[in-house]
């Protein structure tokens, strides 16, 4: 079993299930005044990056430019809980249109009919593409992997 912190955990069945789920990610970042922020957000896993999208005027983009270190959690709320914890660096790219990964996320979250319909309402809208490169990965499944406080 891969150790907590290993990028190999991204291939674990728990990670794969959560990365393919319709659960929102929770993006944690540092605000301009140094305080922590957490926001729920749609995501798409490319196999290498967690990609988020945001309106180009979203305040979080300024904060990510100042400090690109982030944490992402994707979890479910059925016992036994499953949690994917990721730390990494966010790279923000401004686009003239909808991010391709946002289209994929919309289809996953809304379904094959409503997802493309939603994206079509956004066509031509500038969007920020936020690609997070994982540097640390952890999994909790409350069966074989527990929070570290329970194993001390």
Per-range role (PLM):
Residues 2-26:
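Short, basic/aromatic recognition patches
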Residues 58-60, 79, 146-147:
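Short, surface-exposed beta-strand-loop junctions and turns on beta-sheet-rich folds
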Residues 15, 23, 48, 82, ...:
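A generic secondary-structure signal marking the coil-to-beta-strand transition
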Residues 1-10, 82-152:
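Charged, gly/pro-rich active-site loop segments
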Residues 2-7, 57-75, 112-116:
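Short, solvent-exposed cationic patches
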Residues 16-17, 42, 62, 120-122:
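Short secondary-structure boundary/capping segments
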Residues 15, 57-60, 98-102:
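Amphipathic alpha-helical interface surfaces
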Residues 22-56, 62-64, 70-74, 83-86:
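Short beta-strand segments
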